[in-house]
C-alpha cells in the first residue's frame, strides 16, 4: 500500500469514556422517569462519541453505556443533519449551491471530527490492499493513509457535494436531514446482522463490539420516524414534490448500499468493524442522496 500521508492517532473524543466501571447495582425495573433519564443520558453519550459537541461530564460513568447508546446514533444523525441543513440554507443565501454544498459538507466533517470519513478511508485501504483477513485488519489499524483511502474519500466527498448542489434548495435540506438520520440507522443495523469481525482487544470502542437487541433497534427506528415527521411538518410541499416513488428509490438504494457492505464485511472480515460501520454510513448516505437527486420520468 502506497503511504501518502500520516493521520493523527485515533484517541477517544472525551476522556470520560475511559473512566473505570463502577460497581453494578441490583437490577430492578426502572420507573418511567428513570427510563427517560437513562435514555437522555445515553443520547448524550452518543453525541459525545460521534461528534465534537460539548456535553456534560458524567458521574460514575459506566462503559456499558457506550454500547447502549448505539440505539441513539440515528438521533445524533438527526442533530447533525439539522445543523448541516441550516448551514446549507445560510450558505445558499450568500453563495451558489455548489459553494453552499462545500461549506455544509465541511461543517459536517468538522462537527463529527471526520469520524465516519475516517472509517471509509481505512476501509478502502484495508479492503483494497489486504488479500487476507489478518492483513486487511492490520492495514485498517494503520494510522497512515494510503492510495485506496485517498481515492475513496475524495470520490465520496465529490459525489456528495455534487449531488447536494444539483438539488433544489428545499430538496437538499430535506435530503441532509433524512440522509444523516437514515444512514446511521442503516449503519447500526450491521450490529444486529453481523458479529464483530475485528480483534476485540484492538477494538476502538470495546463495548460497541456487541449486538443490538430488538428493543434497541425499535428505539433507533423511532429517530427516523421523528425525522420524517419533522420534514413533513416543515417542508410539506417539498415532500410531496419529491413523490412516493423517489422516496422509495432513495430508501431502496440506501438498503442496497448497506447490504453490499454487509456482504463485503462478512466475506472479507467475517463481521463488522468500527471502520466498516463508518464506511457503511458514508455509502448509504450517498445512496440516499442519489435516490433523491435522480430524475424519474413520469409514467
List PLM regions with ranges.
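Glycine/small-residue-rich loop that forms an oxyanion/phosphate-binding "nest" at active or ligand-binding sites
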Residues: 118
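Cytosol/matrix-facing amphipathic helices and coiled-coil assembly/linker segments
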Residues: 126, 137-140
Amino acid at each position: 500500500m502506497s503511504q501518502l500521508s500520516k493521520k493523527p492517532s485515533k484517541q477517544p473524543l472525551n476522556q470520560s469514556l475511559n473512566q473505570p466501571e463502577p460497581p453494578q447495582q441490583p437490577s430492578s425495573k426502572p420507573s418511567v422517569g428513570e427510563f427517560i433519564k437513562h435514555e437522555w443520558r445515553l443520547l448524550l453519550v452518543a453525541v459525545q462519541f460521534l461528534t465534537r459537541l460539548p456535553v456534560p461530564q458524567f458521574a460514575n460513568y459506566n462503559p456499558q453505556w457506550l454500547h447502549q447508546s448505539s440505539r441513539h446514533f440515528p438521533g445524533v444523525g438527526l442533530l447533525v443533519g439539522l445543523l448541516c441543513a441550516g448551514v446549507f440554507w445560510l450558505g445558499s443565501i450568500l453563495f451558489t449551491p455548489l459553494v453552499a454544498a462545500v461549506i455544509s459538507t465541511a461543517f459536517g466533517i468538522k462537527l463529527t471530527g471526520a469520524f465516519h470519513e475516517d472509517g471509509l478511508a481505512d476501509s478502502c485501504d484495508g479492503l483494497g490492499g489486504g488479500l487476507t483477513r489478518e492483513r486487511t485488519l492490520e492495514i485498517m489499524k494503520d494510522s497512515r493513509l494510503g492510495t485506496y483511502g485517498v481515492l475513496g474519500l475524495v470520490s465520496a466527498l465529490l459525489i456528495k457535494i455534487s449531488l447536494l448542489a444539483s438539488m433544489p434548495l428545499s430538496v437538499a435540506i430535506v435530503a441532509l436531514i433524512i440522509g444523516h438520520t437514515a444512514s446511521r440507522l442503516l449503519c447500526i443495523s450491521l450490529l444486529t446482522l453481523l458479529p464483530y469481525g475485528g480483534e476485540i482487544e484492538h477494538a476502538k470502542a470495546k463495548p460497541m463490539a456487541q449486538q443490538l437487541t430488538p428493543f434497541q433497534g425499535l428505539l433507533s427506528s423511532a429517530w427516523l420516524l421523528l425525522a420524517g415527521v419533522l420534514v413533513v411538518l416543515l417542508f410539506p410541499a417539498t415532500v410531496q414534490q419529491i413523490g412516493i416513488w423517489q422516496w422509495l428509490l432513495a430508501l431502496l438504494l440506501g438498503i442496497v448500499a448497506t447490504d453490499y457492505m454487509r456482504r463485503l464485511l462478512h466475506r472479507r472480515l467475517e463481521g463488522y468493524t468500527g471502520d466498516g460501520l463508518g464506511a457503511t454510513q458514508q455509502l448509504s448516505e450517498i445512496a440516499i442522496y442519489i435516490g433523491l437527486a435522480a430524475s424519474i420520468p413520469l409514467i
